[in-house]
Amino acid sequence: MDIDQIEFKTNVFVLALRDVVVFPGMVVPLFVGRPKSMNALNAAMKEDKQIFLVTQKNATEETPTIDNLYQTGVMANILQLLKLPDGTLKVLVEGVKRFELLALNDEENFLTGDIQQVESDEQLDNDGVVLVRTIQERFQDYAALKKKIPSEVLKSVQKITDPNRLVDTISANLKLGIEEKQTLLEILTINDRLEHILKTIETEIDLLESEQRINSRVKKKMDQTQRNFYLNTKLQAIHEELGDSSEDGVSEFTRLKEQIEQAGMTKDALKVAEDELKKLKMMSPQSPEANIIRTYIEWLVSIPWKKRSRVSKDLNKAQTILDKQHYGLEKVKERIIEYLAVQKRVNKMKGPILCLVGPPGVGKTSLARSIAEATNRKYVRMSLGGVRDEAEIRGHRKTYLGALPGRVIQKMKTAGTRNPLFLLDEIDKMARDLRGDPASALLEVLDPEQNKAFNDHYLEVDYDLSDVMFVATSNSMDIPEALLDRMEIIDLAGYTENEKLNIATQHLLPREIKEHGLKQGELEVPSDTILKIIQTYTREAGVRLLDQSLAKICRKSLKEIVTNEAKAPITVTPDTLDKYLGVAKYRFGLADETNQIGQVAGLAWTRVGGDLLRIEATAMPGKGKNTSTGQLGSVMQESTQAAMSVIRSRSKELGLPDDFYEKQDVHLHFPEGAIKKDGPSAGIAICTAIASVLTQIPVRSDVAMTGEITLRGEVLPIGGLKEKLLAAARGGIKTVLIPYENVRDLAEISDEVKEGLDIHPVQWIDEVFKIALESFPNVENDEISAISMKDAEMGKLVANKQSTKEIQKKSPKRH
């Protein structure tokens, strides 16, 4: 029987549908997998190929009851039935008429039911005719927005004249929920159905237009590089459309606001932070600019604005800490104690800016750490070696991609307090290039009048550095003058043998034993062994190589104990030292055993301390040509020319013929030619070497000298006296000649350095010849100084620096 002729029918095969509603006139493919549903289809195919389709209320129920099925369904024709490889069925059905389910029979193999055709009012009034036309137009608008409705469906909708067929076709092509579609299926009055479908279309059009607005806004905010953030930005735009914002955004904004309020910023910084926070609130969290502003605010709140360490004012405690961790260095310790003493009386004072100048290994960096502990300050270190970009100090503008504050602000954040001890390590190793001069940028940091308003390029707000205690370290005075002027220079010259011995015994050896896991009593290194290491295995101003040598002894001793090559305790004697450190690298006492013609020991200052400078001269028949070799700088070459002029002016006193310079060539050589040499302080040594080779009088091998020479033969003062005296002592020199005006410097040099040295101040080159040469021919000037460290007059000169007219001269020191 044709479905159109059925009004009531019993025992109709029932197919329960999940998540789909079939309308009359629809051709729908269905996938069927439940056994009873497949049996019902197979049975219907054998009979009249008709089946009743009804939707489940709860799609998860496997065996539905009549209570779980909607009352209204569709009687359909089975057009095609296919069996799939997995045993399930694919069926193509066409909905024909709406029927009402009256009863449901759950038989053994399938479901059957009693159904009755639904009678509906199909009479259209005038409003209904208008509704049909409006629905067709609005559906066309919907299709234009949706852009997924097939053109065949659009043409079909425009040609439909049956209002029920129109509603069914449109309902099938709208993206609606199951309940909404079922409602449209169940409405009986045609006018009500038309009004309902029109309202549904209008709602869908509004949603599509809102989505288009959201998409348009999102695309405007995005550029090509941010396509990966599209979905997140779209979600944010949806929240904005609803007048809401994400919970994460609210919590982040609140957190930043609280941090700004608690940071204790200055008024200017607070205003900038609040303005930036307002900008951040108006932005999408995923936009690149929002990340820049967020990072900027986090930097502002993370640096210390008001938190301070409580500076210790206990002078005894500070002295104890400094003495415990460092041997000697009395001038530095005294300066720190003076600073603490002033702080005891004055609440607010400018932080001192100290510069520790000395060769490597004398303990500059470790001393800064001890000062921080003694004053109870946080310790931060910034290495300036090789820094050549101004932005390293002041930072980059925050508009640059990946910009950060300069290292000064970064280290202040690390310190966590606004009054740490800030170590500027290797300040003399800074360079400069096209990107700027970092030394000039440091002027603002180290100037007490300016650093209370230090302006980092990234922060762009003033930050107060006036409470910071700056300590710089340097190997030399080769620092820009403007920077040098802002620092208090404290000279750390090299250690004496006795100081090195004490440092090794009290600090280095116990530390190395502990770090290498040796137990107490397993290794003994007597003082005479350490002294031999100092004399024959190291030649340095500091103690770094000494520390490495002791570490090597500890390693080898531990290996012997662990491998049972030796039993503890192991005692390293001077005789067994080569077993642990190999053959001695240096010969203690560099002075020659015999006096030599034309060979003089000069004294030089280097960045790593003092050193002996060997000078050789030889003369040969020629035409008066003077040659200098040994990688000499321009200043030293000029010194050789001045020295030759001095010799020529004193040819009579030296017993030389007037035309000696026309018949002899003189060659000056400075051994270790791979090392560059420069400076004026070798003037008197060069003069002595030339005088010796021309007169054939040997130079005393136990004499070393330093001093600049003038054309009149006057000896001018030099710098680095302590380092040079230490070098003389290390080289086994007994007698040292120094410029007369350097006598005043002896007062600041410890007696330990001066012990064992016979120091002679000299004013004129004739005095040098008198002492350095074995003999002095034709001496006409008896006013040669015979002052030495053994004379009582030396004590008077040192005690009363202004006692003679010569010492009152203010000649500048020269290196």
UniProtKB/Swiss-Prot annotation:
Residues binding ATP, per UniProt? G358, P359, P360, G361, V362, G363, K364, T365
The places in or outside the cell where this protein is found are: Cytoplasm
Q: Does the keyword Nucleus apply?
A: no
**What reaction does this catalyse?**
Hydrolysis of proteins in presence of ATP
| Top-level class of the enzyme under EC nomenclature | hydrolase
Please state every residue range assigned to the domain named Lon proteolytic.
Answer: 594-775
Question: Which biological processes are named by the entry's GO terms?
Answer: cellular response to heat; protein quality control for misfolded or incompletely synthesized proteins
- Domain Lon N-terminal, first and last residues per copy: 12-205
* GO CC, one annotated term: cytoplasm
Assembly mode: Homohexamer. Organized in a ring with a central cavity.
Protein name as it appears in the record: Lon protease 1
What does UniProt list as this organism's lineage?
Bacteria, Pseudomonadati, Pseudomonadota, Gammaproteobacteria, Thiotrichales
